[in-house]
């Protein structure tokens, strides 16, 4: 081996070996335990970012470790290739989304290969390819036949000037991104999948996932939002209309003072027929497009409809108001308002002078002031007829029973979860496989017509989807009769909901999945991705697995046994303010820094000498120009160094602060490992280790080696605290660099230690370890080596080093047998020449012994 560590020479050679020998190709083998490790696949945006590198490094470390344990490891890779950004980029670069996407995939694949990830590239998937989305289209038609798919009108962002639907990202401050026309809310027919049919299974399944982060499970539970309540029907006075509400607080029913309805509720339209002021308010509320997350903070607005609901128990007339905080797609689109016991209802009632009736009082003697805020806790009932004095449970059941007997109420379990709207009025997505016949009937496309291929050679004008603009594209026939293809495309979450399963059989042509392959590899053993996917992708991923199970493709209930959510990668961000008061962000790579003695930044300047504001460590992003290019870092330091820093700088689930000084430190450490192997290689051991001929120092060094092996095995395998595993190897390296290589047994102990160090580092820094493994005289490649095992006997200490203090000050250290009792330790300690100086002619007051560690002798003259 050469004397200097040169990653630029080592890494390409090792990567070529892996590629030529298909080292990471996974083949089903029933005789071996399988391990399926999967990192969430990326959107091919053009360049890898450090968030990608962190995700895939974690996955690669786990995969390589599991392979060394003897498991049959599958680590595939692919591309979540459909999506809106491709359309914007195509318009900007005057190209087609497909061309832009495929170029990005090719470039990013080269970047990934530079980092040495052990992917099985034979299983590569790009979701924009017809051989992938064909089966998604087919599955959708099967779900339709099962009654799990339906079409209904739903609200979209509509630009009246361009006559086109806009994604949320294309609406800037309420206006169209392209022509600046105010955006309207428009109802159009869209396709939905009945995820609500699986709400209870999705909720219950969370209890079977002990190795998923609690935070993800809590977020999913809240998103599914199971509640038990009562649906109550009110008659509308002087009409034949009825209005239904759902409440989880029937105990407050006698305190209802008004009903709130959504702007899109049929009663609102009825009331607005002869009321132009109300009609204008309704239109304004519809166009405002309120997200559920904004409900708590937005200004509450409303207008009376002039209609009244009849309270089914008291006969009281309750005014019906259109309220901007009631959403048509949530619940029934109407709410019963109890201002005394709901803060939102209280604020609305105060604003519009509506009645506030107390029907709950605190159980304890607590002072409440209903002129200032609502009392929202459970309590006992007042002003509630025969239910006065009852607690929450008694009142819930009593009032629910009464409403059910009267035929105006029914107990109901509701979910916050809504059905999954999968229609997108965009071009770059998989076409929805439904056909409209001349008589208006809508039917699924037959299998022989699939895939319905998205044309790739298109011109983007930035207004209409090419398949909507080209009227001929939609024209087709079914059984010889004219029909029209659906011009909406699938939500891209469709593709990412089943890709993990297709990886088990990506070339399979006879169906969506090869059940034999799928059931060998699935469920995924380890899934890795950001927590930002908790309530979208990770919920659809679980839902789709249950759909695949019910279709007979898989036998497991959940798609992944274990989930790791890696933290974000942060970097310093710097800016200056332009003459127009705009923040201009400067890349950290262009910034000259001055630091104080503690390493804190005290001054930052750009290449023009401008003083910059340091806005701290923030998530790497294009908007703040603080992304660090992984490729540049690999070229500068080597892939192994980048990988090592990524795994060492922070626990995997926590944010990671990018510090180039830390990267330099990682490079220095690998240089030390290289140097130690090089020094050993100049005079290697010629005989094998003789455990019966070891000196005390050699035994201690061996003990440190095997303790490190045990810790690293536990840290990587069970705890997944990769940073502490690396720290343990670094600590061991400090001891090894000081160890003697003089005797044959010294060198034999070092040979064992270096073999262990190289194997422990291999999952993290595979290129250098590949080379060092060969330098240590191993004939086969390290890729097939077994994980190093700790020798339990070596870790047993037959001797202990005892620190001896006299009156709290260290006066000596003595070696005793590991099983020595206190009297033996005292005898040996008191015989130590240095200790004797401080206790001779002194009166021993007491002796404190901390077993196996410390002896403190308290003396006085």
Curated annotation (Swiss-Prot):
Gene3D superfamilies tied to this protein: 2.20.28.290, 3.10.20.590, HUPs, Isoleucyl-tRNA Synthetase, Domain 1, Valyl/Leucyl/Isoleucyl-tRNA synthetase, editing domain
Binding positions (ATP): 622
Broadest EC class assigned to this enzyme: ligase
Keyword Ligase carried by entry: yes
Sequence motif 'HIGH' region, residues: 42-52
Keyword field: Aminoacyl-tRNA synthetase, ATP-binding, Cytoplasm, Ligase, Nucleotide-binding, Protein biosynthesis
UniProt keyword annotation of Transmembrane helix present: no
EC number: 6.1.1.4
Location of this chain's protein in the cell: Cytoplasm
SUPFAM superfamilies per UniProt: Anticodon-binding domain of a subclass of class I aminoacyl-tRNA synthetases, Nucleotidylyl transferase, ValRS/IleRS/LeuRS editing domain
Domain of life: Bacteria
Coiled coil, from the record: none
CDD domains in the record: Anticodon_Ia_Leu_BEm, LeuRS_core
Motif segment ('KMSKS' region): 619-623
GO molecular function list: aminoacyl-tRNA deacylase activity; ATP binding; leucine-tRNA ligase activity
GO cellular component terms listed in the entry, alphabetical order: cytosol
GO biological process: leucyl-tRNA aminoacylation
Catalytic reaction equation(s): tRNA(Leu) + L-leucine + ATP = L-leucyl-tRNA(Leu) + AMP + diphosphate
Protein family according to the UniProt entry: Belongs to the class-I aminoacyl-tRNA synthetase family.
Name by which UniProt lists this protein: Leucine--tRNA ligase
Organism: Haemophilus influenzae (strain PittEE)
């Amino acid at each position: 081996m050469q004397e200097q560590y040169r990653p630029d020479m080592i890494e390409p050679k090792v990567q070529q070996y892996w590629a030529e020998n298909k080292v990471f190709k996974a083949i089903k083998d029933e005789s071996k335990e399988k391990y399926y490790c999967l990192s969430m696949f990326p959107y091919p945006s053009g360049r890898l970012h450090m968030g990608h590198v962190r995700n895939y490094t974690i996955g690669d470390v786990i995969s390589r470790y599991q392979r060394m344990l003897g498991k049959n490891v599958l680590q595939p890779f692919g591309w979540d290739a459909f999506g809106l950004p491709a359309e914007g980029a195509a318009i900007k670069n005057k190209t087609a989304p497909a061309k832009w996407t495929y170029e990005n995939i090719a470039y990013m694949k080269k970047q990934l290969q530079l980092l040495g990830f052990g992917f099985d590239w034979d299983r590569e998937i790009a979701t924009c390819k017809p051989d992938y989305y064909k089966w998604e289209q087919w599955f959708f038609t099967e779900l339709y036949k099962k009654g799990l798919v339906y079409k209904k009108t739903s609200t979209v962002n509509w630009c009246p000037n361009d006559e086109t639907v806009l994604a949320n990202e294309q609406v800037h401050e309420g206006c169209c991104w392209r022509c600046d026309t105010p955006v309207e809310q428009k109802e159009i027919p869209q396709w939905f999948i009945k995820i609500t049919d699986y709400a209870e299974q999705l909720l219950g399944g969370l209890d079977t996932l002990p190795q998923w982060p609690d935070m993800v499970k809590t977020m999913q539970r809240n998103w599914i939002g199971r509640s038990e309540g009562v649906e109550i029907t009110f008659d509308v006075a002087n009409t034949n209309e009825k209005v239904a509400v759902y409440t989880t607080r029937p105990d407050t029913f006698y305190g209802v003072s008004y009903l709130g309805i959504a702007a899109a509720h049929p009663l609102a339209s009825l009331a607005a027929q002869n009321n132009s002021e109300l009609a204008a308010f309704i239109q304004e509320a519809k166009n405002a497009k309120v997200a559920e997350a904004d409900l708590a903070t937005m200004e509450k607005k409303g207008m009376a409809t002039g209609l009244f609901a009849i309270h089914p128990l008291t006969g009281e007339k309750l005014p019906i108001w259109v309220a901007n905080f009631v959403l048509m797609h949530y619940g029934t689109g109407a709410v019963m308002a109890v201002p005394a016991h709901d803060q939102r209802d209280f604020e609305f009632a105060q604003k519009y002078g509506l009645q506030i009736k107390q029907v709950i009082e605190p159980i304890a003697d607590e002072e409440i002031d209903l002129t200032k805020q609502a009392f929202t806790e459970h309590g006992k009932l007042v002003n509630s007829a025969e239910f006065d004095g009852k607690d929450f449970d008694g009142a819930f059941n009593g009032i629910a029973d009464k409403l059910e007997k009267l035929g105006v109420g029914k107990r109901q379990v509701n979910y916050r979860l809504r059905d999954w709207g999968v229609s997108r009025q965009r071009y770059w997505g998989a076409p929805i496989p439904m056909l409209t016949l001349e008589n208006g009937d809508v039917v699924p496309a037959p299998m022989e017509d699939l895939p319905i291929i998205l044309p790739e050679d298109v011109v983007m004008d930035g207004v209409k989807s090419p398949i909507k603009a080209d009227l001929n594209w939609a024209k087709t026939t079914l059984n010889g009769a004219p029909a029209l293809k659906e011009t909406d495309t699938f939500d891209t979450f469709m593709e990412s909901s089943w890709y993990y399963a297709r990886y088990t059989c990506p070339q399979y042509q006879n169906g969506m999945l090869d059940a034999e392959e799928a059931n060998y590899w699935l469920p995924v053993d380890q899934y890795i991705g950001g927590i930002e996917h908790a309530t979208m992708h990770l919920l659809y991923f679980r839902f789709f697995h249950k759909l695949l199970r019910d279709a007979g493709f898989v036998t497991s209930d959940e798609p992944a046994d274990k989930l790791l959510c890696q933290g974000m990668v942060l970097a310093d961000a710097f800016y200056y303010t332009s003459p127009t008061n705009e923040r201009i962000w400067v890349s950290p790579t262009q910034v000259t820094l001055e630091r104080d003695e503690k390493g804190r930044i005290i001054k930052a300047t750009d290449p023009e000498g401008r003083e910059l504001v340091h806005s701290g460590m923030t998530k790497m992003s294009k908007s703040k120009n603080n992304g660090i290019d992984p490729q540049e870092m690999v070229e500068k330091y080597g892939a192994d160094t980048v990988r090592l820093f990524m795994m060492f700088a922070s626990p995997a689930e926590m944010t990671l602060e990018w510090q180039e000084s830390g990267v330099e430190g990682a490079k220095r450490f690998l240089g030390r490992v290289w140097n130690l192997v090089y020094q050993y290689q100049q005079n290697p051991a010629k005989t094998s280790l003789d455990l019966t001929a070891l000196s005390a120092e050699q035994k201690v060094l061996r003990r440190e080696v095997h303790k490190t092996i045990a810790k690293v095995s536990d840290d990587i395998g069970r705890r997944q605290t990769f940073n502490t595993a690396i720290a343990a190897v670094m600590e061991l390296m400090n001891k090894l660099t000081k160890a003697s290589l003089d005797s044959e047994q010294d060198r034999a102990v070092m040979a064992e230690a270096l073999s262990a160090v190289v194997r422990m580092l291999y999952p993290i820094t595979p290129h250098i370890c590949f080379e060092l493994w060969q330098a240590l005289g191993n004939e086969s490649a390290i890729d097939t080596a077994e994980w190093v095992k700790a020798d339990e006997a070596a870790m047993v200490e037959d001797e202990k080093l005892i620190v001896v203090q006299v009156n709290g000050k260290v006066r000596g250290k003595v070696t005793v047998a590991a099983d020595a009792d206190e009297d033996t330790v005292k005898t040996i300690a008191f015989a130590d020449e240095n200790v004797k100086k401080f206790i001779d002619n002194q009166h021993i007051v007491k002796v404190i012994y901390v077993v196996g560690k410390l002896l403190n002798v308290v003396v006085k003259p």
